[in-house]
Design a protein with these regions (language model features):
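Short beta-strand-to-loop acidic/aromatic patch adjacent to the donor-nucleotide binding site
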Residues: 3-14
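Active-site-proximal beta-strand/loop segments in catalytic clefts of secreted hydrolases
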Residues: 9-11, 79-82, 187
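Surface-exposed, flexible loop/turn segments at secondary-structure boundaries
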Residues: 14, 82-85, 190, 196-198
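C-terminal catalytic/acceptor-binding lobe
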Residues: 143-198
Length: 198
């Protein structure tokens, strides 16, 4: 099935179309797109090219062509949502072994209070799959082995600490290992329907 992007949405996510377009805008940042004018020769009523005073064909602007630099696209782009406690978000950063152990085996999640103050997209090590856009080429990358969402054992350097991570965490680990950045835009918050919409 040919596609440009896949949008992964959990069934408990609350959003409007503006949030979708914001996600697409983040995946294609301004610096990834250049615009070139398209000109055509001016023709008379007989269909012949009209020449200017300098003897060269007259031209007119007929459109604009946008060119995407695929190296500047963001292959994995996410918004965020609050989890059930209303304070923790769906994006996180990995911790070093000692910090992971002292944090009770939990990643360093962005908190609602902190992420709300951010103004620009930033990279994360993990995103929940409730609201994430994935570019064609990520799943197809040779280092992204199927099944893409298989739980796996995350082992820290010393071997003394291990964590059985879930399917979305394992996908993020594999994506980063394959060289993909995971981006989050703090301005793209979607609702998360639990006992209430948070």
């Amino acid at each position: 099935l040919p596609y440009d992007y896949q949008l992964w949405i959990d069934s408990d996510i609350v959003f409007n179309t503006e949030k979708f377009w914001q996600l697409l805008d983040m995946a294609l940042p301004e610096e990834a797109v250049t615009t070139e004018p398209i000109y055509e020769d001016v023709k008379d009523e007989k269909g012949e090219v009209v020449l200017g005073d300098d003897g060269k064909p007259k031209t007119k602007l007929t459109g604009l062509k946008q060119i995407v630099d695929t190296e500047k696209e963001r292959p994995i782009s996410a918004g965020w949502y609050a989890t059930e406690d209303g304070r923790t978000t769906s994006v996180a950063h990995w911790l070093e072994e000692d910090d992971f152990r002292s944090n009770g085996g939990v990643m360093n999640h962005e908190m609602v209070e902190g992420i709300s103050k951010r103004k620009k997209p930033f990279t994360v090590d993990y995103t929940g799959f409730g609201w994430v856009l994935i570019k064609n080429g990520v799943f197809e990358h040779p280092e992204m082995k199927y099944p893409w969402f298989a739980p796996k054992m995350q082992e820290f350097e010393s071997g003394a600490v291990q964590d059985m991570c879930g399917e979305d965490v394992s996908f993020c680990l594999d994506a980063i290992e394959a060289g993909f950045d995971i981006w989050c835009d703090p301005r793209i918050r979607v609702g998360h329907e639990k006992t209430r919409v948070i």
